[in-house]
Amino acid sequence: MTFDVKACGARIRELRMKNGLTQETLAEDLNITDVHLRRIESGVRGGSIELLIELADYFHVSLDYLILGRGGRTDEAKEELNRIREQVEHIMRLL
C-alpha cells in the first residue's frame, strides 16, 4: 500500500465540496494560502502530516481515510454505534 498524493487531494476536495466550502474559506480556516490548498487538492504536492491531521479533525474523518482512503467518517461510525447500542438496549428490555 502506498500513499497516492492525487487520491488524497481528491478526497480533501470532495470533503470540502460536500461541506459547501470554497478553497479560500477552507484555506483561511486552516491558516494556509488558497494556492497551497489548490496544489494539495490537485495532487501537485502533499500536505504535511500536521496539516493532514488538522484536515482529518476538521472534517471528522480518520487520518487513515484521508491518507489511504480506508475507513470513513468518524461521525458516521459513531452514529452507527449509537444505533446498534439502542437496538441492543431495546432487545435487553424485551428479555
Task: Report each predicted region and the residues it spans.
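Alpha-helical residues within the helix-turn-helix
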Residues: 17, 28, 57
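A short, Lys/Arg-rich alpha-helix, primarily the initiator
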Residues: 1-18
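Residue-level detection of the helix-turn-helix DNA-binding "recognition helix"
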Residues: 17, 31, 42-44, 71
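Short, charged recognition helix plus adjacent turn
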Residues: 68-95
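DNA major-groove recognition helix of helix-turn-helix/homeodomain DNA-binding modules
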Residues: 31, 50-65
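Short alpha-helical DNA-recognition segment
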Residues: 20-39
